[in-house]
Curated annotation (Swiss-Prot):
GO terms for cellular component: plasma membrane. The lineage of its organism: Bacteria, Pseudomonadati, Pseudomonadota, Betaproteobacteria, Burkholderiales. Keywords: Cell inner membrane, Cell membrane, Heme biosynthesis, Membrane, Transferase, Transmembrane, Transmembrane helix. It comes from Leptothrix cholodnii (strain ATCC 51168 / LMG 8142 / SP-6). The gene is ctaB. Pathway: Porphyrin-containing compound metabolism; heme O biosynthesis; heme O from protoheme: step 1/1. This is Protoheme IX farnesyltransferase.
Length: 305
Protein backbone atom coordinates (compact mmCIF):
# COMPACT_ATOMS: atom_id res chain seq x y z
CA UNK A 1 0.00 0.00 0.00
CA UNK A 2 2.93 2.34 0.74
CA UNK A 3 4.60 1.99 -2.67
CA UNK A 4 1.77 3.60 -4.70
CA UNK A 5 1.48 6.40 -2.13
CA UNK A 6 5.21 7.00 -2.28
CA UNK A 7 5.16 7.07 -6.09
CA UNK A 8 2.21 9.47 -6.11
CA UNK A 9 3.99 11.74 -3.65
CA UNK A 10 7.12 11.72 -5.81
CA UNK A 11 5.14 12.66 -8.93
CA UNK A 12 3.35 15.43 -7.03
CA UNK A 13 6.64 16.80 -5.72
CA UNK A 14 8.20 16.66 -9.19
CA UNK A 15 5.19 18.46 -10.65
CA UNK A 16 5.47 21.25 -8.05
CA UNK A 17 9.13 21.69 -8.95
CA UNK A 18 8.28 22.23 -12.61
CA UNK A 19 5.49 24.65 -11.68
CA UNK A 20 7.94 26.60 -9.50
CA UNK A 21 10.23 27.02 -12.52
CA UNK A 22 7.52 29.03 -14.26
CA UNK A 23 7.45 31.74 -11.55
CA UNK A 24 3.63 31.64 -11.27
CA UNK A 25 3.22 35.02 -9.52
CA UNK A 26 5.29 36.86 -12.10
CA UNK A 27 3.53 35.13 -15.00
CA UNK A 28 0.16 35.89 -13.40
CA UNK A 29 0.86 39.64 -13.66
CA UNK A 30 2.11 39.20 -17.24
CA UNK A 31 -1.07 37.40 -18.28
CA UNK A 32 -3.23 39.97 -16.46
CA UNK A 33 -1.60 42.84 -18.39
CA UNK A 34 -1.96 40.94 -21.67
CA UNK A 35 -5.65 40.30 -20.94
CA UNK A 36 -6.19 44.00 -20.26
CA UNK A 37 -4.70 44.77 -23.67
CA UNK A 38 -7.06 42.25 -25.28
CA UNK A 39 -10.18 43.64 -23.64
CA UNK A 40 -9.28 47.26 -24.37
CA UNK A 41 -8.73 46.42 -28.04
CA UNK A 42 -12.36 45.32 -28.45
CA UNK A 43 -14.97 48.11 -28.70
CA UNK A 44 -17.87 47.35 -26.37
CA UNK A 45 -18.54 43.98 -24.82
CA UNK A 46 -16.57 41.16 -26.48
CA UNK A 47 -18.58 38.64 -28.49
CA UNK A 48 -18.14 34.89 -28.44
CA UNK A 49 -15.59 35.00 -31.26
CA UNK A 50 -13.60 37.66 -29.40
CA UNK A 51 -13.70 35.67 -26.17
CA UNK A 52 -12.55 32.54 -27.99
CA UNK A 53 -9.59 34.34 -29.52
CA UNK A 54 -8.77 35.96 -26.17
CA UNK A 55 -8.74 32.58 -24.44
CA UNK A 56 -6.38 31.10 -27.04
CA UNK A 57 -4.17 34.19 -26.82
CA UNK A 58 -4.10 34.00 -23.03
CA UNK A 59 -3.11 30.34 -23.16
CA UNK A 60 -0.36 30.95 -25.71
CA UNK A 61 1.10 33.95 -23.89
CA UNK A 62 0.96 32.08 -20.57
CA UNK A 63 2.86 29.13 -22.06
CA UNK A 64 5.60 31.26 -23.62
CA UNK A 65 5.93 33.45 -20.51
CA UNK A 66 6.28 30.30 -18.40
CA UNK A 67 8.91 29.02 -20.83
CA UNK A 68 10.87 32.26 -20.49
CA UNK A 69 10.75 32.01 -16.69
CA UNK A 70 11.99 28.41 -16.79
CA UNK A 71 14.82 29.36 -19.17
CA UNK A 72 15.76 32.21 -16.82
CA UNK A 73 16.03 29.71 -13.94
CA UNK A 74 18.21 27.50 -16.14
CA UNK A 75 20.64 30.30 -17.04
CA UNK A 76 20.78 31.72 -13.50
CA UNK A 77 21.18 28.41 -11.68
CA UNK A 78 24.48 29.40 -10.06
CA UNK A 79 23.39 32.97 -9.37
CA UNK A 80 20.13 31.80 -7.77
CA UNK A 81 22.02 29.43 -5.48
CA UNK A 82 23.96 32.39 -4.02
CA UNK A 83 20.90 34.55 -3.32
CA UNK A 84 18.56 34.08 -0.35
CA UNK A 85 15.59 35.26 -2.42
CA UNK A 86 16.08 32.60 -5.10
CA UNK A 87 18.02 29.80 -3.40
CA UNK A 88 14.80 27.77 -3.04
CA UNK A 89 14.28 27.39 -6.80
CA UNK A 90 14.45 23.78 -8.03
CA UNK A 91 17.38 24.43 -10.38
CA UNK A 92 19.33 26.27 -7.66
CA UNK A 93 18.77 23.37 -5.23
CA UNK A 94 19.71 20.78 -7.84
CA UNK A 95 16.26 19.18 -7.76
CA UNK A 96 15.92 19.68 -11.51
CA UNK A 97 18.84 19.46 -13.91
CA UNK A 98 19.72 21.99 -16.60
CA UNK A 99 18.64 19.47 -19.24
CA UNK A 100 15.25 18.99 -17.61
CA UNK A 101 14.73 22.75 -17.36
CA UNK A 102 15.80 23.25 -20.99
CA UNK A 103 13.46 20.55 -22.32
CA UNK A 104 10.59 21.87 -20.19
CA UNK A 105 11.15 25.42 -21.44
CA UNK A 106 11.39 24.27 -25.07
CA UNK A 107 8.16 22.27 -24.84
CA UNK A 108 6.25 25.18 -23.27
CA UNK A 109 7.60 27.69 -25.80
CA UNK A 110 6.85 25.45 -28.78
CA UNK A 111 3.32 24.76 -27.56
CA UNK A 112 2.68 28.44 -26.90
CA UNK A 113 4.00 29.49 -30.29
CA UNK A 114 1.86 26.88 -32.04
CA UNK A 115 -1.25 28.10 -30.21
CA UNK A 116 -0.58 31.75 -31.01
CA UNK A 117 0.37 31.17 -34.65
CA UNK A 118 -2.52 28.85 -35.50
CA UNK A 119 -5.35 30.02 -33.21
CA UNK A 120 -4.61 33.76 -32.90
CA UNK A 121 -2.42 35.34 -35.61
CA UNK A 122 1.21 35.19 -36.80
CA UNK A 123 1.98 38.75 -35.66
CA UNK A 124 1.19 37.93 -32.04
CA UNK A 125 3.22 34.73 -32.27
CA UNK A 126 6.33 36.50 -33.56
CA UNK A 127 5.99 39.40 -31.12
CA UNK A 128 5.70 36.91 -28.27
CA UNK A 129 8.75 35.00 -29.49
CA UNK A 130 10.64 38.29 -29.66
CA UNK A 131 9.60 38.98 -26.07
CA UNK A 132 10.88 35.54 -25.05
CA UNK A 133 14.26 36.22 -26.67
CA UNK A 134 14.37 39.72 -25.18
CA UNK A 135 13.84 38.46 -21.63
CA UNK A 136 15.39 35.01 -21.60
CA UNK A 137 18.44 35.81 -23.72
CA UNK A 138 19.14 39.54 -24.11
CA UNK A 139 18.17 40.53 -20.56
CA UNK A 140 19.16 37.39 -18.64
CA UNK A 141 22.37 36.51 -20.49
CA UNK A 142 23.67 39.88 -21.72
CA UNK A 143 22.25 42.83 -19.77
CA UNK A 144 21.66 41.60 -16.23
CA UNK A 145 25.26 40.54 -15.47
CA UNK A 146 26.90 43.45 -17.34
CA UNK A 147 25.17 46.78 -16.68
CA UNK A 148 23.26 48.54 -13.88
CA UNK A 149 20.88 49.75 -16.59
CA UNK A 150 19.79 46.13 -17.12
CA UNK A 151 16.29 46.83 -15.79
CA UNK A 152 15.84 49.94 -17.94
CA UNK A 153 16.92 48.39 -21.25
CA UNK A 154 15.58 44.93 -20.46
CA UNK A 155 12.31 46.49 -19.38
CA UNK A 156 11.27 46.62 -23.04
CA UNK A 157 10.56 42.89 -23.06
CA UNK A 158 8.78 43.07 -19.71
CA UNK A 159 6.57 45.87 -21.02
CA UNK A 160 5.28 43.88 -23.99
CA UNK A 161 2.28 41.92 -22.55
CA UNK A 162 -0.48 44.53 -23.17
CA UNK A 163 0.87 45.09 -26.68
CA UNK A 164 0.73 41.33 -27.27
CA UNK A 165 -2.87 41.35 -26.09
CA UNK A 166 -3.71 44.26 -28.36
CA UNK A 167 -2.09 42.58 -31.37
CA UNK A 168 -3.92 39.34 -30.61
CA UNK A 169 -7.31 40.99 -30.99
CA UNK A 170 -6.58 43.50 -33.76
CA UNK A 171 -3.81 41.85 -35.76
CA UNK A 172 -1.77 45.05 -35.66
CA UNK A 173 0.44 47.17 -33.41
CA UNK A 174 -1.56 50.33 -32.77
CA UNK A 175 -0.66 53.50 -30.83
CA UNK A 176 -2.98 52.44 -28.01
CA UNK A 177 -1.05 49.21 -27.50
CA UNK A 178 2.24 51.09 -27.59
CA UNK A 179 0.99 53.48 -24.89
CA UNK A 180 0.16 50.55 -22.62
CA UNK A 181 3.61 49.16 -23.31
CA UNK A 182 5.22 52.51 -22.47
CA UNK A 183 3.43 52.68 -19.11
CA UNK A 184 4.90 49.35 -18.00
CA UNK A 185 8.31 50.34 -19.39
CA UNK A 186 8.30 53.46 -17.17
CA UNK A 187 6.92 51.51 -14.19
CA UNK A 188 9.59 48.80 -14.30
CA UNK A 189 12.68 50.69 -12.97
CA UNK A 190 11.13 52.09 -9.76
CA UNK A 191 9.43 48.74 -9.17
CA UNK A 192 12.61 46.66 -9.43
CA UNK A 193 14.95 49.20 -7.86
CA UNK A 194 12.78 49.26 -4.73
CA UNK A 195 13.31 45.49 -4.54
CA UNK A 196 17.02 45.86 -5.25
CA UNK A 197 17.42 48.32 -2.36
CA UNK A 198 16.54 45.82 0.32
CA UNK A 199 18.16 42.94 -1.57
CA UNK A 200 21.41 44.78 -2.35
CA UNK A 201 23.57 42.38 -0.33
CA UNK A 202 22.00 39.45 -2.16
CA UNK A 203 22.78 40.97 -5.56
CA UNK A 204 26.32 41.89 -4.50
CA UNK A 205 26.94 38.34 -3.29
CA UNK A 206 25.75 37.02 -6.65
CA UNK A 207 27.97 39.48 -8.54
CA UNK A 208 25.08 41.26 -10.27
CA UNK A 209 25.57 44.99 -11.01
CA UNK A 210 22.19 46.22 -9.83
CA UNK A 211 21.97 49.99 -9.34
CA UNK A 212 22.24 49.98 -5.50
CA UNK A 213 25.37 47.81 -5.79
CA UNK A 214 27.14 49.96 -8.40
CA UNK A 215 25.86 53.47 -7.56
CA UNK A 216 24.78 53.21 -3.94
CA UNK A 217 21.59 53.40 -1.94
CA UNK A 218 21.04 57.17 -2.07
CA UNK A 219 21.50 57.45 -5.84
CA UNK A 220 19.05 54.59 -6.40
CA UNK A 221 16.44 56.21 -4.16
CA UNK A 222 16.72 59.45 -6.14
CA UNK A 223 16.28 57.56 -9.41
CA UNK A 224 13.16 55.87 -8.04
CA UNK A 225 11.71 59.26 -7.11
CA UNK A 226 12.47 60.77 -10.52
CA UNK A 227 10.99 57.80 -12.34
CA UNK A 228 7.73 58.00 -10.38
CA UNK A 229 7.23 61.54 -11.71
CA UNK A 230 7.93 60.41 -15.27
CA UNK A 231 5.62 57.44 -14.74
CA UNK A 232 2.78 59.69 -13.60
CA UNK A 233 3.15 61.72 -16.80
CA UNK A 234 3.16 58.51 -18.85
CA UNK A 235 -0.02 57.22 -17.24
CA UNK A 236 -1.87 60.31 -18.48
CA UNK A 237 -1.33 59.34 -22.12
CA UNK A 238 -4.41 57.08 -22.38
CA UNK A 239 -6.55 60.11 -21.51
CA UNK A 240 -4.65 62.36 -23.92
CA UNK A 241 -4.96 59.75 -26.69
CA UNK A 242 -8.71 59.42 -26.12
CA UNK A 243 -8.47 55.84 -24.87
CA UNK A 244 -10.04 56.73 -21.53
CA UNK A 245 -12.22 59.22 -19.72
CA UNK A 246 -12.23 61.11 -16.46
CA UNK A 247 -12.62 58.04 -14.27
CA UNK A 248 -9.28 56.63 -15.40
CA UNK A 249 -7.65 60.05 -15.22
CA UNK A 250 -8.66 60.41 -11.57
CA UNK A 251 -7.38 56.92 -10.76
CA UNK A 252 -4.08 57.60 -12.56
CA UNK A 253 -3.54 60.78 -10.54
CA UNK A 254 -4.41 59.19 -7.19
CA UNK A 255 -2.26 56.10 -7.79
CA UNK A 256 0.59 58.11 -9.28
CA UNK A 257 0.69 60.61 -6.43
CA UNK A 258 0.59 57.77 -3.93
CA UNK A 259 3.58 56.14 -5.65
CA UNK A 260 5.41 59.48 -5.58
CA UNK A 261 4.60 59.76 -1.86
CA UNK A 262 6.19 56.38 -1.19
CA UNK A 263 9.23 57.31 -3.30
CA UNK A 264 9.58 60.68 -1.56
CA UNK A 265 9.52 59.08 1.88
CA UNK A 266 12.02 56.47 0.69
CA UNK A 267 14.37 59.15 -0.60
CA UNK A 268 14.17 61.31 2.53
CA UNK A 269 14.37 58.61 5.19
CA UNK A 270 15.39 55.15 4.00
CA UNK A 271 14.46 51.96 5.77
CA UNK A 272 14.31 48.40 4.54
CA UNK A 273 10.68 48.18 5.65
CA UNK A 274 9.78 51.24 3.57
CA UNK A 275 11.59 49.83 0.53
CA UNK A 276 9.52 46.66 0.89
CA UNK A 277 6.33 48.72 1.18
CA UNK A 278 7.25 50.71 -1.92
CA UNK A 279 7.93 47.53 -3.88
CA UNK A 280 4.61 46.00 -2.83
CA UNK A 281 2.69 49.18 -3.60
CA UNK A 282 4.22 49.31 -7.07
CA UNK A 283 2.52 45.99 -7.87
CA UNK A 284 -0.81 47.33 -6.63
CA UNK A 285 -0.22 50.53 -8.59
CA UNK A 286 0.07 48.76 -11.93
CA UNK A 287 -2.75 46.31 -11.23
CA UNK A 288 -5.22 48.99 -10.08
CA UNK A 289 -4.18 51.37 -12.87
CA UNK A 290 -4.96 48.83 -15.58
CA UNK A 291 -8.13 47.73 -13.80
CA UNK A 292 -9.27 51.38 -13.72
CA UNK A 293 -8.52 51.70 -17.43
CA UNK A 294 -10.69 48.66 -18.12
CA UNK A 295 -13.57 49.89 -15.93
CA UNK A 296 -13.38 53.27 -17.64
CA UNK A 297 -13.43 51.56 -21.04
CA UNK A 298 -16.70 49.78 -20.30
CA UNK A 299 -18.20 52.78 -18.50
CA UNK A 300 -17.69 54.92 -21.59
CA UNK A 301 -19.34 52.24 -23.73
CA UNK A 302 -22.38 52.22 -21.44
CA UNK A 303 -22.65 56.00 -21.57
CA UNK A 304 -22.67 55.99 -25.37
CA UNK A 305 -25.52 53.46 -25.62
Amino acid sequence: MNAPSSAAGHVSSHWRQYVALTKPRVVQLIVFCAAIGMLLAVPGAPGLADLGKALWATLGIWLVASAAAAFNCLIEQQIDSRMKRTAWRPTARGELSRTQALIFSAVLCSAGMAVLHEAVNPLTAWLTLGTFVGYAVIYTVVLKPLTPQNIVIGGISGAMPPLLGWAAMTGEVGPEGLILCLIIFLWTPPHFWALALYRAEDYARAGLPMLPVTHGNEFTRLQILLYTFVLLAGTLLPFVQGMSGWLYLAAAFVLGLRFIHYAWRLWRNYSEALARQTFRFSIWHLSLLFAALLVDHYTQDLLTL
